[in-house]
Every structure is written in C-alpha cells, then in structure tokens.
C-alpha cells in the first residue's frame, strides 16, 4: 500500500480530514509496518509539534488498516496519551526516516510505536508512542454532540493564536495565556466537530516557554508527554498553569496544565528541555 492508496482508501474513512491530517508522499506499508521519509523540514523548538502531527497521522492510518473496516463509515482515533523522547543529541539531519507500526489492544484501544531515524546512519533520533481510543462514527457524534458546528469553513489558517507569559511571585510558577482558537485554525479536526488539536495547544505552550527561556538556539526538547482528559473547544481562552524546576545543570522540567478561565482542566503536558551548551 502506497501514499496514493492511503489517500484513496483510508483517509476518507477516518475522523481527521485534510488539511489537518498530514502524511508524507512516499509511504510504504509492508505488512503491519509503515515506512516513510521526510526531507527539508525544521523540527526544532516548538516546531517539534509538526513532527508529532505527522507521526499521529501515520498512527491513525496504520490503525485503520489493522481494523480492516469494510463498513465505509468513519472511524475516529482520539489520542489518549502521547510520548516522544530524543535518543540522540546529534543535529537532526535534513532527511529522516520513520519506521514502526501500530497494534490493537482491543476493539476500542490501539497504540502506535514509531522511530524517527537518520536516513544515512540508521541511528534512532526519536522514539514515539501514542495511545488511542477507537470510536465509531455514531458514538463520536453522541459523545461530542455539543461540539457540532456545520458552519462552512473557508481558508485554512495556519497561524496559531497568540500567547503571553504571566510571571508570578513564585520562581517556580508561571502562567501562559493562549487566545481562543478559530474554526479556520482547526479545519479538518474533526469535520463539523471542531476540536482544538493537542499538537496545536502544545505548539503554543512550547513557543511561549522558549520565548521565556530566551536565546532559543541553545535549547532543545529532551522529552515530551501529553495526557488529554477532555476535548478542547474553539472560541475558548486557555490558561496554562506551569510549574518549572531545574533538575540537573542542563535540564529544566516543565509541568503544564491546560485550563480554561473557569478552571476546567483539559490536558497536561510534561516537558524536559535540555541546554545544548552544557551537554
């Protein structure tokens, strides 16, 4: 199965749609494993979420193939828990390969495990895991009926909302304000049920953290974990409560809880950021 096959026989039947879903042009399915490569993209700092988006899209496609669905009704793959870890501290090369696959834990849960490698040396650069809930179309519509919105969406807006760091008197605590997401920014996730993608909120949080740290070129993400507890609506201002602590001379830990202005919690992101100058 190639990228063309995936676009024709898988993507129309999963919850994510274009332009949100993002897969490379040279995918090969070999049994239950998936292989592809990417060139010329910047995954530094908050741009690591662009890689997460690609990996999550590949995981959804791989799980759909495993299900061998013949009903032609949409199946929704909702991320429960995400983990990515950097395993090499060499500079990320221009061309990387992605290999791995997905497996089913049950009819309602699945997992994707992928490695990002240096194409030339074969060295593993990142390990990635994503746990999914697998939901039928009818169940999705029932669970998320309050999100239904059939307003026609025009141009896809790739620019994410602005944010602001709010320092507190406590050295270990700060907050991040993130302006509301729009329909256009969340186009394709999911069709007629606009939900803010986890990778988008993570991008905004990381962007503000790197701005807070300053001198962005000396830092890199060592690991990132995310746990979603509730779907994030558009049109809502988010307040991110951040706890930070330097565990090692060159490693800073951040725990970020995403809430709305009423205090409702939606997700937690745990990030370890390493200073490149002291490795």
Identify the function of each model-found stretch.
Residues 18, 116, 196-199, 205, ...:
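Extended aliphatic helical segments
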Residues 1-46, 105-111, 117, 123, ...:
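Non-catalytic linker/capping segments at the edges of enzyme domains
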């Amino acid at each position: 199965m190639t990228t063309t096959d995936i676009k024709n026989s898988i993507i129309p039947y999963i919850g994510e749609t274009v332009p949100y879903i993002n897969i490379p042009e040279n995918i090969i399915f070999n049994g239950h494993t998936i292989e592809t490569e990417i060139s010329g993209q910047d995954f530094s700092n908050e741009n690591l979420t662009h890689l997460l988006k690609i990996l999550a899209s590949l995981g959804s496609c791989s799980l759909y193939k495993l299900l061998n669905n013949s009903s032609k009704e949409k199946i929704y793959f909702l991320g429960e828990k995400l983990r990515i870890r950097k395993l090499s501290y060499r500079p990320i090369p221009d061309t990387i390969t992605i290999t791995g696959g997905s497996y089913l834990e049950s009819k309602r849960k699945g997992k994707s495990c992928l490695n990002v490698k240096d194409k030339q040396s074969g060295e593993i650069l990142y390990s990635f895991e994503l746990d999914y809930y697998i939901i039928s179309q009818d169940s999705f519509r029932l669970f998320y009926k309050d999100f239904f919105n059939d307003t026609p969406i025009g141009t896809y807006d790739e620019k994410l909302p602005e944010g602001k760091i709010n320092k507190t008197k406590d050295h270990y605590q700060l907050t991040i304000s993130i302006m509301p997401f729009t329909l256009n920014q969340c186009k394709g996730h999911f069709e007629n049920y606009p939900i803010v993608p986890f990778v988008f909120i993570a991008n905004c949080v990381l962007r503000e953290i790197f701005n807070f740290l300053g001198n962005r070129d000396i830092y890199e993400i060592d690991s990132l974990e995310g746990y979603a507890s509730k779907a994030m609506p558009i049109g809502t201002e988010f307040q991110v409560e951040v706890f930070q602590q330097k565990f090692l001379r060159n490693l800073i830990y951040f725990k970020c809880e995403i809430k709305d202005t009423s205090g409702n919690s939606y997700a937690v992101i745990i990030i370890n950021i390493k200073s490149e100058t002291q490795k």
